[in-house]
Amino acid sequence: MANVVVVGAQWGDEGKGKIVDWLSERADVIARFQGGHNAGHTLVIDGTVYKLHALPSGVVRGGKLSVIGNGVVLDPWHLVAEIETVRAQGVEITPETLMIAENTPLILPIHGELDRAREEAASKGTKIGTTGRGIGPAYEDKVGRRSVRVADLADDATLEARVDRALQHHDPLRRGLGIEAVDRDGLIAQLKEIAPAILTYAAPVWKVLNEKRKAGHRILFEGAQGALLDIDFGTYPFVTSSNVIAGQAATGVGIGPGAIDYVLGIVKAYTTRVGEGPFPTELDDADGQRLGERGHEFGTTTGRKRRCGWFDAALVRQTCATSGVNGIALTKLDVLDGFETLKICVGYDLDGKVLDYLPTAADQQGRCAPIYEEMDGWSESTEGARSWADLPGNAVKYVRRIEELIQCPVALLSTSPERDDTILVTDPFAD
């Protein structure tokens, strides 16, 4: 049985939620392998809208095992609230349908406070544009070996020692930012109170997944955000604090890289970005406004308006390489309906030199001017198309040109938020 990794191939918000939901019907296990509740998935199922941030998309599908892996940083209070929200929508969540890796680091209130204080203190041009939910500081504590992890909640002495170690680092930082010292006893009390609700789902995920794999179960690895926000290969420092590319799927749940059979990159038919950082094809004109309005480009987590621009084939070709993408799912093609002319970025002009990739140096990224190729648009509607025959000729040409430029085939084509409005070209789960 094939196992599939789903990764965003742009700056996030590519429509991963719908694609993961579409694929999860045939998966046995759906595993989140990185990120926190700073990323959101919106699923539309039989007219019901589910907005998920911490929970894997598979929870809304009965009979599946959903997993939160060790590569995730988890806000336990947010998770409990999100579980209650989806339960109120009729979704059943039990220890048989949801597991949390015992070695998953927790996001504490002190992480969010530090995150927000840093953003407020940052001068113009140095703000990252975080969601303020503590994801970055939580990953810092993980690397600094001072995290409170899920397993630590089971023993009071261990929990108190972990908190004390974290506060040795945080209290001096807080003083420097003008924040009062942490209420140690209050924080420990909060953690002890939430512990039973989290420990109910705690499990040795690495062991469970390896057993599932040996038994021939299909595993769907669900990434958050997008490869251009990867801590190593994204537009640093305007990135997230974890590895987002497909290689993280193995590390983030504790399964070997040989378990990955297919990497599906999710790609929007145009480009969007939330927060600060370079964006070569960004449009500040009527076309950009039109893309944002037609695509409903507002963040699931923050409600922030997304920056919009033309499709950047050079960037997507780059992310397909760093994630080893076998095929892409192209989403939101219907947003382009009615544009007379479409543009695709095929490379960059950097001080008179033509590049076919975005350079690493931040100053060079800011000076890269897009080199565009123009294509005729289409006036007909593509919304709800479920076969190639339903698409206008120019829409098919646009998709084919994208395939040529990014050097990767289209495996799936999405033409609306509804899960069934999908054209299947190549089955990622095919053995």
Curated annotation (Swiss-Prot):
Binding-site residues, IMP: D13, E14, G15, K16, N38, A39, G40, H41, T131, R145, Q225, T240, R304
EC number(s) stated in the UniProt entry for this protein: 6.3.4.4
Alphabetical list of SUPFAM superfamilies matching this protein: P-loop containing nucleoside triphosphate hydrolases
Co-factor requirement: Mg(2+)
Catalytic reaction list: IMP + L-aspartate + GTP = N(6)-(1,2-dicarboxyethyl)-AMP + GDP + phosphate + 2 H(+)
Residues where substrate binds: T300, T301, T302, G303, R304, K305, R306
CDD domains registered for this protein in UniProt: AdSS
Compartmental location: Cytoplasm
Entries under InterPro entries matching the protein: Adenylosuccin_syn_GTP-bd, Adenylosuccin_syn_Lys_AS, Adenylosuccinate_synth_dom1, Adenylosuccinate_synth_dom2, Adenylosuccinate_synth_dom3, Adenylosuccinate_synthetase, P-loop_NTPase
Binding site for Mg(2+): D13, G40
GO cellular component: cytoplasm
Keywords noted in UniProt: Cytoplasm, GTP-binding, Ligase, Magnesium, Metal-binding, Nucleotide-binding, Purine biosynthesis
Gene Ontology biological-process annotations: 'de novo' AMP biosynthetic process; IMP metabolic process
Matching Pfam families: Adenylsucc_synt
Residue positions binding GTP: 12-18, 40-42, 306, 332-334, 414-416
Note describing how the cofactor binds: Binds 1 Mg(2+) ion per subunit.
Family under the similarity heading: Belongs to the adenylosuccinate synthetase family.
HAMAP family: Adenylosucc_synth
UniProt subunit comment: Homodimer.
Name of this protein: Adenylosuccinate synthetase
Lineage of the organism: Bacteria, Pseudomonadati, Pseudomonadota, Alphaproteobacteria, Rhodobacterales
